[in-house]
Design a protein with these regions (language model features):
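A charged, aromatic-enriched C-terminal amphipathic alpha-helix characteristic of glycosyltransferases
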Residues: 21, 25, 302-353
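Nucleotide-activated donor-binding/catalytic signature segment of Leloir-type glycosyltransferases, i.e.
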Residues: 210-231
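Short hydrophobic beta-strand element within catalytic cores of glycosyltransferases
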Residues: 266-269
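Aromatic "clamp/platform" in nucleotide-sugar-dependent glycosyltransferases that forms part
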Residues: 248-249
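Extended catalytic core of nucleotide-activated donor transferases of GT-like folds
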Residues: 41-112
Length: 357
């Protein structure tokens, strides 16, 4: 029995999974974790290390479904050919994305019926609470949920290149409401009025014409543009990033923030519960309001070396070592493989070492 991955928005171009958004990145991650896997798509094709198969041709595999709310419907479709469809939910976003009661109930039913793997402890807790509140008690008692922090490819980090003018990053690729882009713009405008900075925002193409993006792009100290062409370029830009200002109200994990921290940027975070899963307790740059955010970001770009020393002290001496111990994607890879083996009896070959593809 093999593995197939389904994400309705995934695009395959020139034999590879295209895009640098979180969904595409995670599909590539799963293909690396399960070599020779399939990707569910509209047209069958052989690609670089994986196959694309239409849903109606999926048979005899564990379907890792990233569109979790659809799993019961997928089960019925697969059941037409397969007497015992095997589906695992992969929740890689915060459950609060579903606000309508019908959507929340559908999510709860899906996670009650099918084993569910989550991208962080916080997400797993929210999933369990949703199932407990929305699903029948006997379904909740039988539900299976596991988690691991997504982590980052530590070997992707590049050597630091400190810029002549400090670079402040908008650490997201969208301008959705929960990211609070207006707060970001308010704070960076204040900081830019006090000291030279270059603010950079790399956004999904559809977001470039949104009002916050247009407003930011009109500032002489700001650059707004599309996502980088490759992961290599992405990490090269992070190596030249001085600081970032996180403003999101809610996150399931915060992969972009972890990557920026691993690259050496000083992160300024809101005082929100999700932040505790990203940085150590006592992290010095957590703000309660816009005034505190301004002061912290100003320090991060004008006294960066001192700020990094504070990060080291908060992490017991070495902030980078703390990050690498807690956000290495090896732990995620091992955990998801273990769950697929335990829940479905799928034999998996051991991963290679640090130089794995």
């Amino acid at each position: 029995m093999g593995v197939a991955v389904r994400l309705s928005s995934v695009r395959v171009e020139d034999g590879r999974v295209a895009g640098h958004d979180a969904g595409a990145t995670l599909v590539r991650r799963l293909l690396r974790v399960f070599p020779g896997s399939q990707v569910v798509g509209p047209v069958a094709q052989e690609c670089d290390g994986f196959s694309v198969v239409p849903l109606e041709d999926v048979w005899g595999v564990v379907l890792v479904n990233m569109d979790v709310i659809d799993s019961p419907c997928l089960w019925h479709t697969l059941r037409l050919r397969d007497p015992d469809p095997q589906i695992m939910n992969f929740v890689w976003w915060h459950p609060s994305r579903y606000e309508h009661p019908v959507e929340t109930s559908c999510l709860a039913l899906s996670c009650a019926l099918f084993p569910t793997f989550c991208n962080s402890e916080r997400t797993a807790t929210e999933v369990r609470e949703t199932v407990s509140a929305e699903a029948a008690p006997h379904l909740y008692q039988r539900s299976r949920t596991a988690w691991a922090n997504l982590g980052v490819r530590l070997d992707h980090a590049r050597p630091r290149e400190e810029p002549a003018v400090p670079v402040v990053l908008y650490p997201a690729i969208s301008l959705e409401r929960r990211k609070r882009p207006d707060l970001f713009l308010d704070v960076v405008e204040r900081v830019a009025a006090r000291t030279p900075v270059r603010v950079e925002a790399r956004l999904e193409e559809s977001q470039l014409v949104e009002e916050p993006a247009l407003t930011l792009s009109r500032r002489e100290w700001a650059w707004v543009g599309p996502l980088t062409a490759s992961r290599t370029t992405y990490w090269e830009h992070l190596a030249r990033t001085t600081a970032f200002l996180a403003t999101a109200w809610e996150e399931s994990y915060g992969l972009a923030y972890v990557e920026a921290l691993v690259a050496g940027a000083v992160g300024v975070f809101p005082d929100r519960p999700w932040v505790r899963g990203v940085v150590p307790s006592g992290y010095p740059f957590v703000y309660r309001d816009a005034d505190e955010a301004e002061d912290m970001l100003h320090r991060a770009v004008t006294d960066t070396a001192a700020c990094r020393r504070e990060l080291d002290r908060a992490a017991g001496g070495d902030f980078q070592a703390w990050l690498r111990a807690r956000h290495d994607d090896d732990a995620f890879d091992r955990a998801v493989r273990s769950c697929v083996r335990r829940w479905f009896g799928v034999p998996v070959e051991p991963l290679s070492g640090p130089g794995r593809p």
